[in-house]
């Protein structure tokens, strides 16, 4: 009787596994999917459960952090591009200081325009939100720098007025979101640091953009047919020195579908979750580990030769042909950043969970290497 029961149970488990494999040919048991609301930190300030989700299940509370307050870093970073022009908005509180920055650059000519508003010893006073997707309003109005960011269930809007040098600098932009817009949410520890160090991040891709940016006599229009926004929403307790790789892109395919990707490594211990995700018409598809071929050559300064990416599951096979390196080199006392954000045209294939292969042709996207001391 017991042997028969075991055989039946074994057969049922086999059928379940076969059915699951047929329905979802790409599943990743090694990455931990968070399926219910979970406090991000425990009573000791350590991560409760490292993992990922596509709709945020983590509950972030800055007051629950027990680490050295100078190590707390929070930011909202919006990047909008139409293939030629790119505008970036950063709201950051790295505890020792805070900043709101706006930068517009032309990837054909290299011309750029910047405005910024700085504060010292902020330690959370920038007032950044505890959740990326809930309706909210952030504003900063200080000495001719006026920034408003509004979030609703269906869109985000950014309104800015300031100066790039002596030239008036204005932006009015609206980013649309899909119903139940899925994103990549990840919480991982830094195993080479104190257990209270962690990285909590959400990437919201594939938001079509409508709007106008003006600087002096220059007018740049962003149209939803070819203009997209990514939000990089980050909260965490970081080591002083960290080096990472991050790639991201969105585009509209010939059939009108909206497709994008998020890849990255170097952000702590990613054994429970990686950033690597494909987005297709508002839905997220988790993929395996990504390798950048000849990564060491890039670090040696070979930034403008082709970048070849491959994944261990074959679901992300892409080549970027660079055309612009958005270089940042900054150091103020003991805080510094060197970043090569390389934009290019991406070609290759991305595979969805159901096995559908999406062919990518000349998607304008980027991958960066960033070395931070903060």
Q: What is the predicted function of each stretch?
A:
Residues 1-12:
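Bacterial N-terminal signal peptides that target proteins for export
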Residues 30-374:
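Structured soluble/peripheral alpha/beta segments that form catalytic or ligand/cofactor-binding pockets
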Residues 11-21:
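Bacterial N-terminal signal peptides
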């Amino acid at each position: 009787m017991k042997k028969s029961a075991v055989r039946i149970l074994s057969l049922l488990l086999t059928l379940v596994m076969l059915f699951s494999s047929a329905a979802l040919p790409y599943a990743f048991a090694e990455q931990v999917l968070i399926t219910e609301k979970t406090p991000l930190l425990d009573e000791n300030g350590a991560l409760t459960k490292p993992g990922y989700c596509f709709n945020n299940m983590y509950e972030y509370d800055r007051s629950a952090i027990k680490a050295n307050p100078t190590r707390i870093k929070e930011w909202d970073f919006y990047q909008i591009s139409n293939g030629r022009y790119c505008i970036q908005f950063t709201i950051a509180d790295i505890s020792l200081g805070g900043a709101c920055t706006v930068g517009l650059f032309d990837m054909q000519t290299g011309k750029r325009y910047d405005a910024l508003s700085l504060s010292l010893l902020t330690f959370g006073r920038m007032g950044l939100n505890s959740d990326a997707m809930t309706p909210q309003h952030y504003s900063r109005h200080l000495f001719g720098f006026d920034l408003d960011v509004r979030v609703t269930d269906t869109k985000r809007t950014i309104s800015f007025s300031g100066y790039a040098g002596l030239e008036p600098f204005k932006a009015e932009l609206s980013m649309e979101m899909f119903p139940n817009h899925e994103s990549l949410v990840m919480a991982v520890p830094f195993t080479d640091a104190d257990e209270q160090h962690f990285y909590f991040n959400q990437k919201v891709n594939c938001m079509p953009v409508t709007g106008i940016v003006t600087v002096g006599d220059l007018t740049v229009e962003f149209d939803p047919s070819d203009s997209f926004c990514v939000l990089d929403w980050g909260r965490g307790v970081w080591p002083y020195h960290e080096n990472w790789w991050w790639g991201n892109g969105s585009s509209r395919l010939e059939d009108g579908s909206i497709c994008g990707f998020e890849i990255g490594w170097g952000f702590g211990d990613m054994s429970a979750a990686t950033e690597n995700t494909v987005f297709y018409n508002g839905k997220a598809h988790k993929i395996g580990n990504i390798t950048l071929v000849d990564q060491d050559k890039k670090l040696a300064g070979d930034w403008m030769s082709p970048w070849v990416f491959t994944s261990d599951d074959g679901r992300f096979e892409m080549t970027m042909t660079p055309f612009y390196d958005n270089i940042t080199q900054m150091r103020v006392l003991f805080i510094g950043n060197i970043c090569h954000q390389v934009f290019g045209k991406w070609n290759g294939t991305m595979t969805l969970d159901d096995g559908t292969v999406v062919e990518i042709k000349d998607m304008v996207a980027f991958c960066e290497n960033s070395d931070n001391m903060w």
